Amino acid sequence: MKIGFDNDKYLAMQSAHIRERIAQFDNKLYLEFGGKLFDDYHASRVLPGFQPDSKLQMLLQLKEQAEVVIVISAEDIVANKMRGDYGITYDVDVLRLIDAFQGVGLFVGSVCVTKYTDAPEVTAFEQKLNGLGIRTFRHYKIPGYPNDVAHIVSDDGYGKNDYIETERPLVVITAPGPGSGKMAVCLSQLYHEYKRGVKAGYAKFETFPIWNLPLKHPVNLAYEAATADLNDVNMSDPFHLEAYGKTTVNYNRDVEIFPVVNAMFELIAGKSPYRSPTDMGVNMAGNCIIDDDVCREASLNEIVRRYFKCLCDQKASGVVKPERFKLELLMNQAGIALGEREVEKRAHAMSEATDGQPAAAIELADGTIVTGKTGPLLGAASSALLNALKKLAGIDQETDLVSARAIEPIQTLKTNYLGSRNPRLHTDEILIALSSSVSENEYAAKAMEQIPNLKGCDIHSTVILSSVDADTLKKLGMYLTCEPTYEEDDRMYHKK
């Protein structure tokens, strides 16, 4: 994989910048932490070289100074709001986050329930945490929020919230998802800190959009693609331009709320430490791009992936996705279209050469493309996977890594005993068959050694793959796109 981002430089520069921001205030900084902390795969795709856990590793460099406060809205607890990526509710995700933070040595100080309401589900959640030794605090709905600044910044506003007791200079405010109230918690804490004579500060940590890249840079367009369902819009920061005469990039929600936040700062502290939304941020990612062309290409590919996913989701649901039109606009702005990538062209060519049967193509790190076709033993994705491993291992494409004799009993098991209509082996099944062939087949052993080199490779399928195949390819770290059509497109029900 071509590298466009210096991860080591990022870890050092980002942690140093946060330390500088802590020092600007009374050795107390509330850091609103947006985005994914443990598994930022979007960042790793658009900034090749950025590790999915880079933000976590950066925090670990500050772990002696840092404590974590997790924020969850009472409304989300009562509504059983789900995290789509993990398939768990927000309240369960709080427990997962606590385990994850503590597991790497970060101190979790407490959990704050925002928009508190006296509901049985909320009480049970608090009691469970307290029983586990985790302190809980309550923040309440404030009438007139966020525009009635005078009321909010008063004893009848923030003053009614619990003061979250913290021990360390850096307080990281994070949450299971958006809309949990992270910024409100930070500002409420500032109010209480100033009441106690502590001149604490606030900063915002978000990787995207990258403030010191151009507005229409593919990395920033890819962020808009990733948040198309939220309708976030990147825009130039007018406050930063007015204050410093410099053009920077932020997104609409931060720009729109800045006058309100600024007024709150002035009421809390007497004056605001910031002159623009960009000033509030601490993101150093833009300074760690070492190959702009690599990041541009990766980001353009990501926009295409997002569009294909939207089309496939639309096909599966039968409902037009509003974000589709936003994604089409972004593709137009980026100057890209479907069918332009070589991996797509080769997959379609293989399908045409096999009378329209499903086909797949994989682009390896060096740009080489291998294809796979539908056969009696393997699906197209499974075939492409084996062919990619052969290519990586320097094995002739005609060599069998797994014999038909080994595959046929698995097919019998699937169709005769497990109720499957499709006898062909899925990607997970062929990998298991490959691993079981290692002791008897030296080529299978060589191919197995190449599996890590599939990470970061694009794979394109001419039909929507099953969730089994999609999950396996995701576990391998491959980037899947599918045409929005099913193998048996005339059927009304399609197994996921």
Stretch-by-stretch model annotation:
Residues V185:
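Hydrophobic positions on the alpha1 helix immediately C-terminal to the Walker A/P-loop
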Residues K373-T374:
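Short clusters of small/polar residues that mark proteolytic maturation junctions
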Residues L377-A393:
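A short, polar/charged loop-to-alpha-helix boundary motif
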